[in-house]
From Swiss-Prot:
Taxonomic classification: Bacteria, Pseudomonadati, Thermodesulfobacteriota, Desulfuromonadia, Geobacterales
Major localisation: membrane
Bilayer topology: Peripheral membrane protein
Keywords associated with the record: Cell cycle, Cell division, Cell inner membrane, Cell membrane, Cell shape, Cell wall biogenesis/degradation, Glycosyltransferase, Membrane, Peptidoglycan synthesis, Transferase
InterPro entries referenced in this protein's UniProt entry, alphabetically: GlcNAc_MurG, Glyco_trans_28_C, GlycoTrans_28_N
Name of protein: UDP-N-acetylglucosamine--N-acetylmuramyl-(pentapeptide) pyrophosphoryl-undecaprenol N-acetylglucosamine transferase
Name of the gene: murG
Length: 366
């Protein structure tokens, strides 16, 4: 069988698609996967490293843009649709999975025109515009959070959880070694592109953390733009910190961490949940429909995490929460146990089962 995974742009969209691709390929050595994305998205940098084939199309967002930009985006959508039809006719997939992001729309629309089975996966509590539209023509909608069900057709919506990569699941099963010298390990990241506000808050927090720096090991994914300045700041303050623009092996980073400071995107929540890590969530305030805050609140209701809203974020506030977790290991353990209950280990298997359960003829020339 052949599968196309369409979408990306950010790790939050791409990583669930990679997880499904891994499971699909593991089922049969003859299976094939093709990703379709854009040259601007994280997929263009990451997928070649992982050995996946990627085709890029033209696509852009429409929501929240100026009238002129909307016209240009609509033109790109039409061009992307034409590109997608050509790719689908050449690859001849059995199924198409849209994972959100700009590239998802023209590909799934093309799949409908070519009568190819098509599915979409929604990662967040509040769906994006692309998936809300595509749900009308999808054979089935897979959701990660029960709260999002009300936005989709009831008879074609299925709660699966958020698919996770095999390396994440493997590290969960392996556990981790004890920290050297009794130091606690803090992982800080703001998504695949970093988060400037989290970066600046950590710089502001360093003076407040000075009294505990001998007992703290920090791994910080900064993104490309802030990497140089962040590296200098940690060095000048005398912290034991690994500062990197991008962490290729997030599974190892999760496994090594004792607690985490991060955003509250759906894929991040799914990964930290199965990893069983206490987290200080700092939701991205400009996410569509404030969905990151809604994602985090679902965990806070069950004492499965901590949250600092960005409008309340200061170096002092962040440092205070970090020090609290360092000083209260029982609280860290309790929170980790609670968040682990949200982990769904079989999401990728369930999705692949559903997509391959009813095989349709290969795409034919239209």
């Amino acid at each position: 069988m052949r599968l196309i995974v369409a979408g990306g742009g950010t790790g939050g969209h791409l990583f669930p698609g990679i997880a499904v691709a891994e499971e699909f390929l593991a089922r049969n050595s003859a299976n094939e996967v093709l990703f379709i994305g854009t040259e601007r998205g994280i997929e263009a940098r990451l997928l070649p490293k992982l050995g996946y084939r990627l085709e890029c199309i033209s696509a852009s967002g429409i929501k929240g843009q100026s009238p002129l930009t909307k016209v240009k985006s609509a033109a790109l959508l039409l061009y992307g649709y034409s590109q997608s039809r050509k790719i689908l006719k050449e690859f001849r997939p059995d199924v198409v999975l849209g994972v959100g992001g700009y590239a998802s729309a023209p590909v799934v629309l093309s799949a409908r025109g070519l009568q190819i089975r098509r599915f979409i996966h929604e990662q967040n509590a509040i769906p994006g515009l692309t998936n809300k539209v595509l749900a009308r023509i999808a054979d089935k909608v897979f959701i990660s959070i029960e709260e999002s069900r009300k936005f989709f057709p009831e008879d074609r919506t299925m709660l699966t959880g958020n698919p996770l990569r095999k390396e994440i699941l493997w590290n969960v099963q392996q556990g981790k070694t004890e920290p050297k010298g009794g130091s606690l390990r803090l992982l800080v990241f703001g998504g695949s592109a970093g988060a400037h506000r989290i970066n600046t808050a950590m710089v502001e927090a360093l003076p407040h953390l000075a009294k505990v720096k001998e007992h703290l090991l920090i791994t910080h994914q900064t993104g490309e733009k802030d990497h140089g300045e962040m590296k200098k700041a940690y060095g000048a303050a005398g912290f034991n910190a690994e500062v990197t623009p991008f962490i290729d092996n997030m599974a190892a980073a999760y496994a090594a961490a004792d607690f985490i400071v991060c955003r509250a995107g759906a894929t991040t929540l799914a990964e930290v949940a199965v990893s069983g890590k206490a987290c200080i969530f700092i939701p991205y305030p400009y996410a569509a429909d404030d969905h990151q805050r809604r994602n985090a609140e679902a965990l806070l209701k069950e004492d499965a995490g901590f949250m600092i809203l960005e409008r309340e974020l200061t170096g002092d506030t962040l440092a205070g929460q970090i020090i609290r977790l360092m000083q209260e290991p029982e609280l860290v353990e309790k929170t980790a146990a609670n968040i682990r209950k949200f982990g769904q280990l079989d999401a990728a298997q369930v999705i692949v089962d559903e997509m391959t359960g009813k095989q349709e003829p290969l795409c034919t020339e239209k």
